[in-house]
Amino acid sequence: MVLSSKNDQPDHLFAAPIEKLGDWAFDEQVAAVFPNMITRSIPGYTNIITMIGMLSKRFVKPHTQIYDLGCSHGAACLSIYPNILDIPSCKIIAVEESPAMIKYCRENLMAHCDQIPIEIIEDDILNIKIDNASMVILNFTLQFLDPGHRENVLNRIYQGLNPGGILVLSEKFHFEDPDIGPLLFDMHHDFKRAHGYSDLEISQKSTMLKNVMRIDSVETHQNRLRQAGFEQMDLWFQCFNFGSLLALKTSSSND
């Protein structure tokens, strides 16, 4: 079950021309409309969140921890929670750097999750030690990190996952193919138009994200996961140029 904040508001942040567009930030304005914004901007987002809950039922083990790195409003945690109620001694650790976003996360998780220990940490995920993890979520988070830090994050996740543990890595993807890449780009814009965004809104948001969100190809992600130590991985969900990978730390893997 995916729950949403009682403070959800429609996203009209970029409906009027903005004279000076700065870089994107997850500030109070964005945080206030984030649930509406993300479901209208990322095709398949709701499906990914729902499936993360289903995956948790399969992979979370007793006496282990689940990490949601870059948890925003806590949607993935809320999806996981009802699926692991019967698994003893689990703990969810939700990490979010943005003070504005984590305010809504706290509100959501405190309102709906009272039967499993949940730790909410306001910090950069680069500072988080992963330990005794059966599941780690990176849901549209890695793309906002400096590319030079991404390998280090995945290395630490791999080291902190228990054998049999899973990483869910959801991202916007870059496609090199000169025909497929532009097609998927245009289809994504069509998706946003179909969800009520004007060309002005799409353009202004894209301009603000340009220097902040640096995306990789599926192959780059897979190579990085292999370098971290993951032996089994695959793309399990894709809609246009957005998707999600699963990476497993096999039972035979050694730290």
Curated annotation (Swiss-Prot):
Its EC number is 2.1.3.-. SUPFAM superfamilies: S-adenosyl-L-methionine-dependent methyltransferases. InterPro entries: CmoA, Methyltransf_25, SAM-dependent_MTases_sf. It is an enzyme of class 2 (transferase). Keywords: S-adenosyl-L-methionine, Transferase. Catalyzes the conversion of S-adenosyl-L-methionine (SAM) to carboxy-S-adenosyl-L-methionine (Cx-SAM). This is Carboxy-S-adenosyl-L-methionine synthase. Belongs to the class I-like SAM-binding methyltransferase superfamily. Cx-SAM synthase family. S-adenosyl-L-methionine binds at residues 45, 70-72, 124-125, 139. The gene is cmoA. Pfam families: Methyltransf_25 (PF13649). GO terms for molecular function: carboxyl- or carbamoyltransferase activity; S-adenosyl-L-methionine binding. GO terms for biological process: tRNA wobble uridine modification. It comes from the Bacteria. The keyword S-adenosyl-L-methionine applies. Homodimer. It comes from Hamiltonella defensa subsp. Acyrthosiphon pisum (strain 5AT). It catalyses: prephenate + S-adenosyl-L-methionine = carboxy-S-adenosyl-L-methionine + 3-phenylpyruvate + H2O.
